[in-house]
Curated annotation (Swiss-Prot):
Domain Helicase C-terminal: 717-891
Gene behind this protein: rad54l2
Family the UniProt entry places it in: Belongs to the SNF2/RAD54 helicase family.
Protein name: Helicase ARIP4
Annotated spans, Disordered: 1-103, 1117-1168, 1194-1250, 1340-1396
Length: 1396
């Protein structure tokens, strides 16, 4: 029990809650980590951001479509990179709504998994093979079980690797980790029975697989019991022999003797308990030889509550101590069940001194080991050290609570001892250093005995307590060196799959991989398919992964459900009654929700719905609870619920500074000072309240100003509760009432004291006296001592006690280790956040020993947060059924309904319109309630289990189960990891002295390379593009293959628009050639005329998507720095300036300063300028038939309004202040040397481009920055051709730019061989002016006029003659260095277009 928590609790807080919390004040940080981990346990990073094409691609399920799966693996990054996410990605992940689906990422390849994971799975595989081999080599004696020989022979021959049921209805597929497909390989050993085949794979590892013939692949194995899974669950074989003996080590080697249970145990155990004992033996012992020579394995005994797990463990321990070398066993149990465990040991295995000397050994066999107990009676360190030392020396079983073990085993507890004595003293404090040293030595001795080396076997009762791997209790348990660990739990999966992983990771460390690997492979696929709004593929993947996880754990998790009880106990009915709020409750709830709505999601309510739940509980249980809290002026966060999931610092604290230590608490053990300081800070420090967003009950004062307490009708829940109590008593049935709120239990007692008891059935008593505590009813909560608890339970269960009819219990204190079969009716007054608690409360009566039909009533306030929490319970229970029990419960709630817990409905249906059909209820008490109080119930009561019906039609067929496991294996292997590209070859080596490079600039420097070592930059990861695409790999030698068809995609325009992305569909009227990249293997990336393209503008940039699925991304480099020189061509008349350069034509240029305040304005994709421009191309194409040869004089660059064409430059480099100043005077003009880097290229003048298609205002080039733009081509899609439309017609009129001043391009835009950012050779020979390939001119250029507008370097392939000024001489090898200098020393996968 968490003593520090209890010590500072108000009387309303149930100490049992803290008993379950078990964390000291030093663990607050760990609880914060737990809360953060629960918010982000999916293991993803950048992929948490919404993928806009997610639903259309449906996560590229590898097992559904291998082709899509391979593509998905290429698009996904590896799990190993998840830790390297940026802060921006983290912020965006946190902003994502909780109810949105998550992207499911693929796991690392299997060879990249942690070695410990592969080792753990391999060891389990080998263990199951050994057991199977033992069954084959040493079959069961035919005389052992009382079953037919035919049935037995079938089981002996066909039982494979701890099968769950008869082989005729069960298949086993052990996961294959070999590199190839092992389904079609391997030796086949066939058995003719039931047409089943047992295959032994011959891959890298031998794996046992069972397959059916083709006729049975689509059949569902519906004969098996779905709630039973694991080994030894065939109760037909779990029987005693003809002599009444129970054999434990079945199929044992001949050199080992038969091991039987003690005679008194053999007479008591049921068939399912025999299976559990054998299951424990197979996992922990396996064989006597292996027990002494190996470290062993752990397992989980996941039997539902009431199936006798304690008896199974006691029986197994008796065998363990008698027949193995085991000496010590540590049993860690909830502190309130310590006495129950000791009583069970004494009952089933009495100590020798308790038996008479002449007792018959064949009837009762005493235990041969001691049972040591460490409880709250052992206060001092010396007393505890004595118990531990006796246990370590004499051997036996040591029983202790979780909190005690944590305190004694963690080393940090040793140094905290002196801090606890920091209270003020009246005089000088004398410290006995010798005594302190002795204390420390004793603590170290205890820790060594408990953990190093620790016991031979560790048993954790209620093992679902190991649900947070960061909590100190879990860490302390994992420090135990023993690998023989047993977890007992009736409810293995409570809240989420990560908690299940924590429990499995305790018994089998690293078996399921790391937390992130488990999240990616199992948790998120299962969660994504849980709700009604999940896609069909999500649901299919959910069923697949649930089955794979269920099968993975089948060898060491034995699950037995309530179906075992149903065959041996009377029937049980659970009814849910949805209750209406009274007027005062509705007013209070409305006001509270309005405060929440005004505060927004950033308030404390939105951040932690459980805090709101604590306040709301006071409203819907009864307004008197809230009224009393208001009178005491308690803070809103001082709830009185025993809720363990409240996260950080949500426990309620006492208003006063007094510390209340319960008799059964561990308050003396734990430091109270820190908690007291925290308590005082809450009370006395207003700023602390504000910082923690603490809200008082001020909002309720006005509504409750005239409130009259003590009226039962103010809460319809309470009215129905007393109806159920009194009617049950009249029928002669005892009843239990569970509530989380201790204040609510107190209010119930106040109303009981005012009401008269009804006359029980068959009683001659008279009605008249009121209820009296400890006479007519009992109350049990966390403050009840262990001895008092045992006395109350025994008296209540006594059939002869006809005075006590009611038992009030707090949900957390009364749901564990309590047997209350004296009652057969239960009322769950309020829904718990954790469905486990309510289920355990129900099972207090529905267990062995119950002789009457059981009726359960769950009261839930409709149209409130409580209803949403109940809905969440159903989802959690459904997930448990899928994973643990392999059931297929029907999904009833959408994810939005589940996650949006603070759902507020202002108006509820009119009570007068509600009609309840009471005839549909066979239960008399409920039927009478519907007749008498129809106005208090919103809907007809329904059965709780009806929401979790097993959908038989959704069960996986045998073929689907194989496909699920095969897909799981393929997915582990096939993901392709992304490796970050290295750009080291683009930068100077460390040994280069930068001062020795003339006029040093990275753009003037190029690395020395061999002839074939061209700089090749890696492609950006495909995830940078919002829409996934399929890369096309086209050979350089086959340019025509660029037009090859690719896999078509359905373009999700509606999802893009819904996400706020602007999508514009444009039909091109002319060919558009996309500039290429240095790493491109495409020789032609072209958008043909008449093709429909989508221009997509999002927050991250602008994209073009072609009809064949290709994506071209355009990124803006941002605004230019203020210090940069921006040039603008001067305005003037035609030919006013002298020619500067010649590349076959004349142009005018005179650089001048451009107004820095006038950047090019961006245009939207549907702007009039763009649409007009496209229309001009359409008009030109229509008139091309009559005008075949555009004239040269119409194509000068001195037209009015032409803006300077863009300049290509590296993204990460600044513009030079003055290029001419860097050229040595003795060199010739550098622009005459410009060419393609490395080997040559095309010289494309800006006259071949229309400026509106080049400048940043074009939607193709537009980015969010609105400034200069650049291409960012994220895949091997580009073509090394340059420019946009190359076809110029005289019919095209030139649009004026945004600048009003007429201008001409500056001189540096008109060189021969205009440099473009490509460092690879496009042609077999090196040329200054290479001819265009003929494929690019396939649109029919004019051929009859030599005076073409196109430069002469097109002549060799287009029938044009070169202009007189065109030079086509090849450059000497040394003349390319200046021409390529501007393109070196940078990231070649980014091309920036900057307007000068």
């Amino acid at each position: 029990m968490s003593d520090a928590s209890i010590s500072g609790s108000e009387p309303e807080l149930d100490p049992e809650d803290m008993e379950e919390e078990e964390e000291d004040d030093e663990d607050d940080d760990e609880e914060e980590e737990e809360e953060e981990d629960e918010e982000d346990n999916d293991g993803d990073d950048e992929d948490d951001k919404q993928d806009i094409n997610e639903k259309s691609q449906n996560a590229a399920l590898g097992e559904d479509s291998p082709e899509q799966g391979e593509e998905g693996w290429k698009r996904s990054t590896t799990s190993g990179q998840s830790g390297q996410e940026s802060d921006e990605a983290k912020k965006k992940r946190l902003q994502k709504p909780a109810n949105l689906r998550r992207n499911i990422r693929k796991l690392l390849r299997e060879d990249q998994l942690e070695s410990v994971t592969k080792t753990a799975q391999q060891e389990e595989l080998e263990r199951r093979k050994r057991l199977e081999q033992q069954r084959k080599d040493y079959p069961l004696p035919l005389t052992l079980p009382p079953v037919s020989l035919d049935f037995l022979q079938e089981e002996i021959e066909l039982r494979a690797a701890d099968v769950s049921q008869l082989v005729k209805s069960q298949e086993i597929i052990c996961l294959d980790s070999s590199s190839g497909e092992s389904d079609d390989e391997g030796k086949v050993k066939s058995h003719s029975i039931k047409d089943e085949i047992i295959e032994l794979s011959s891959g890298e590892e031998d794996n046992l697989q069972i397959s059916d013939n083709a006729d049975s692949t689509n059949e569902v194995d519906g004969d098996i019991t779905t709630e039973n899974s694991g080994s030894h669950v065939n109760d037909a074989l779990n029987q005693a022999d003809h002599l009444g003996r129970v054999l434990v080590n079945i199929n044992h080697p001949p050199n080992e003797k038969d091991i039987f249970l003690a005679p008194q145990l053999a007479r008591a155990v049921k068939s399912h308990q025999i299976g559990g004992i054998r299951f424990l033996y197979d996992n922990l012992v396996e064989s006597l030889e292996r027990f002494s020579g190996s470290s062993g394995f752990g397992c989980i005994l996941a039997h539902s509550m009431g199936l006798g797990k304690t008896l199974q463990v006691i029986s197994f321990l008796d065998v363990l101590f008698q027949h193995t070398s085991a000496k010590t066993v540590l049993a860690i149990v909830p502190v309130n069940t310590l006495q129950n465990w000791l009583a069970e040991f004494n009952m089933w295995l009495p100590p020798p001194e308790s038996l008479p000397k002449d007792h018959n050994q064949e009837l009762v066999q005493p235990r041969a080991f001691k049972v040591h107990t460490m409880n709250d009676e052992h206060k001092t360190t010396a007393a505890r050290a004595k118990v531990v030392n006796d246990w370590a020396t004499d051997g036996g079983v040591l029983l202790m609570g979780y909190e005690m073990y944590r305190l004694l085993s963690l080393k940090k507890s040793f140094t905290a001892g002196r801090k606890k004595k920091s209270k003020k003293a009246a005089g000088p404090v004398i410290i006995d250093l010798d005594e302190e040293d002795r204390q420390q030595e004793m603590l170290k001795g205890i820790e060594k005995a408990l953990s190093r080396p620790g016991p031979d076997v560790v048993i954790c009762d209620e093992g679902h307590r190991i649900k947070n791997c960061h909590a100190s209790t879990s860490q302390a348990l994992k420090n135990i060196r023993s690998r023989r660990r047993v977890v007992l739990t009736g409810y293995p999966l409570q809240n989420n799959l990560i908690e299940y992983w924590c429990m499995v990771d305790f018994v089998r460390p690293d078996f399921l991989g790391t937390r992130q690997e488990f999240s990616n492979m199992f948790e998120r696929p299962i969660l994504n398919g849980q709700c009604v709004d999940s896609t069909p593929q999500d649901k299919r993947l959910m069923r697949y992964r649930s089955h794979v996880l269920h099968s993975l754990l089948e060898g060491f998790v034995q699950r037995r459900g309530h179906t075992v009880l149903k065959a041996q106990l009377p029937f049980k009915e659970e009814h849910v009654i949805l209750v209406r709020l009274s007027k005062i409750q509705r007013d209070l709830y409305t006001e509270f929700m309005n405060r929440f709505r005004d505060a927004g999601n950033s308030g404390w309510l939105g951040l932690n719905p459980l805090k709101a739940f604590c306040v709301c509980c006071k409203i819907w249980n009864h307004p008197d609870v809230l009224y009393e809290a208001l009178q005491k002026e308690n803070l809103a966060n001082e709830q009185d619920l025993d809720v363990e999931d409240l996260g950080t610092n949500n426990r309620c604290n006492a208003q006063s500074g007094k510390i209340k230590v319960e008799p059964n608490s561990l308050g003396a053990l734990m430091g109270e000072t820190a908690h007291t300081k925290q308590l005082q800070g809450i009370v006395l420090n207003p700023s602390h309240e504000k910082a923690n967003q603490v809200v008082t009950y001020e909002w309720a004062k006005e509504i409750l100003s005239d409130y009259i307490p003590g009226q039962l009708q103010n809460s319809p829940k309470m009215v129905l509760l007393f109806h159920l109590i009194e009617e049950s008593m009249r029928m002669g049935d005892k009843i239990l009432v569970f509530s989380q709120s201790l204040s609510t239990l107190s209010i119930m007692e106040e109303f009981l004291a005012k009401r008269k008891m009804p006359i029980p059935a068959g009683s001659d008593g008279q009605e008249g006296h009121t209820w009296i505590r400890n006479v007519n009813y009992y109350r049990l909560d966390g403050s009840t001592s262990a001895s008092e608890r045992e006395r109350l339970i025994n008296q209540f269960n006594d059939p002869s006690n006809e005075k006590v009819w009611l038992f009030l219990l707090s949900t957390r204190a009364g749901c564990l280790g309590v047997n209350l079969i004296g009652a057969n009716r239960v009322v769950v007054f309020d829904a718990s956040w954790n469905p486990c608690h309510d289920a355990q409360a129900v099972c207090r009566v529905y267990r062995y020993g119950q002789r009457k039909p059981c009726y359960i009533y769950r009261l839930v306030s409709d149209f409130t947060l409580e209803k949403k929490i109940y809905d969440r319970q159903i989802t959690k229970q459904g997930m448990s059924d899928r994973v643990v029990d392999d059931l297929n419960p029907e999904v009833n709630f959408t994810r939005r309904e589940v996650e949006n817990l603070l759902h507020f409905v202002e108006e509820e249906p009119d009570a007068s319109r509600q009609h309840l059909d009471s005839s549909s209820f066979h239960e008399a008490v409920l039927q009478k309630a519907c007749l008498q109080y129809p106005h208090l119930i919103t809907k007809e009561p329904f059965q709780h289990e009806s929401l979790l019906l097993d959908r038989k039609e959704q069960k996986l067929t045998l073929a689907e189960k194989k496909a699920a496991k095969r897909g799981y294996e393929e997915e582990k292997r096939a993901s392709v990891p992304y490796t970050r590209p290295s750009y080291t070859q683009y930068y100077p080596a460390p040994d280069h002295n930068l001062g020795n490079i003339p006029a040093f600039s990275q753009r003037h420097w190029r690395p020395l390379m061999k002839g074939d070592d061209r700089p090749v930059a890696s492609v950006r990861p495909l995830q940078s593009t919002p829409i996934p695409m399929l890369p096309r790999h086209v050979s350089v030698n086959h340019p025509g293959s660029a037009s090859a068809s690719v896999h078509p995609y359905n373009f999700p325009v509606n999802y893009l628009q819904r996400a706020g992305v602007l999508v514009q569909k444009v039909v091109t009227t002319t060919d558009i050639v996309i500039p290429g990249m240095t790493t491109s293997t495409d020789v032609q990336a072209r958008i043909s005329a008449g093709e429909s393209i989508h221009v997509i503008r999002g927050t991250k940039g602008t994209y073009i998507r072609t009809s064949d699925g290709r994506i071209f991304a355009i990124r803006a480099s941002g605004k230019q720095k203020s210090g940069e020189v921006r040039r603008q061509a001067t305005s003037g008349a035609q030919g006013s300036s002298a020619p500067y350069l010649s590349n076959g034509r004349h142009s005018t240029s005179s650089p001048s300063q451009q107004d820095s305040e006038d950047p090019p304005r961006p245009l939207s994709p549907d702007s009039p300028e763009i649409l007009n421009e496209l229309q001009k191309y359409a008009d030109a194409a229509a008139a091309r038939g009559s005008h075949t040869a555009p004239q040269l004089q119409n194509l000068g660059l001195h037209h009015q309004g032409i803006n300077p064409a863009p300049k290509l430059q590296p993204r990460k480099r600044k513009d030079p202040q003055d290029q001419s100043s860097h050229w040595p005077s003795n060199k010739r003009n550098p622009y005459s040397q410009l060419s393609y880097p490395n080997t040559g290229g095309f010289g494309v003048t800006p006259s071949t481009m229309n400026h509106n298609l080049v400048r940043s205002s074009n939607p193709v080039f537009m980015g969010p920055g609105g400034g200069s733009s650049h291409f960012q081509l994220p895949s091997l899609l580009s073509d090394p051709q340059t420019g946009l439309p190359l076809v110029q017609d005289s019919l095209l009129t030139h649009s004026s730019g945004t600048s009003s001043a007429p201008s001409v391009p500056p001189h540096y835009l008109l060189p021969r061989g205009f440099p473009l950012p490509f460092s690879q050779s496009l042609l077999p020979q090196t040329r200054m002016f290479a001819p265009y390939p003929s494929q690019i001119l396939n649109r029919g250029l004019p051929t009859n006029n030599p005076a073409s507008t196109f430069p002469g370097y097109l002549s060799s392939h287009s029938n044009y003659q070169a202009s007189p000024g065109t030079s086509s001489r090849p450059l000497p090898s040394g003349e390319t260095e200046l021409g390529s200098c501007e393109e070196d020393g940078r990231d070649d996968d980014v091309v920036e277009v900057t307007g000068e």
